Regions:
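A carboxyl-terminal module marker
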Residues: 1-128
């Protein structure tokens, strides 16, 4: 390397990009933007410490039904006020119908269905 005037710690790489350029890009599928507002409700569920937030989130998503647009964990807490061996997982639920504005009752029913699924699958209780 010294004969070429290059530092001792030099490397060279050759990339053949033709394989990448020849591949067809996957189609991007976008959801249409709704003209109706979302209804957001939060829920904090107390579960056994062995239940992961991902497991609980998946159960909540399945239980909430077709009106659920998104569900995101925004807090996991174990400490004062939570029984030993348990934790509280707080989840933001966003509901939306593609063809109408949801009523508060519809959003609450979907939330309750999500909570019921978590209760059945993980013994979850609403944090008071």
């Amino acid at each position: 390397m010294a004969a070429e005037g290059l530092p001792e710690r030099t490397c060279a790489v050759e990339l053949d990009l033709s394989a990448l350029l020849e591949r067809e890009a996957p189609a991007v599928v976008a959801q249409p933007i709704s003209g109706y507002p979302a209804a957001t409700q939060d829920v904090a569920l107390v579960v056994d410490g062995s239940v992961t937030a991902a497991q609980l989130l998946e159960t909540v998503r399945r239980g909430a039904g077709e009106l659920l647009e998104s569900a995101d964990v925004f807090d996991v807490y174990a400490g004062t006020g939570i029984p030993e061996g348990k934790k509280s997982v707080a989840i933001a639920l966003r509901f939306r119908a593609p063809d109408r504005t949801l009523t508060a009752d519809e959003a609450s029913q979907a939330r309750e269905a999500a909570v019921a699924a978590a209760r059945d699958a993980h013994g979850a209780e609403i944090r008071s």
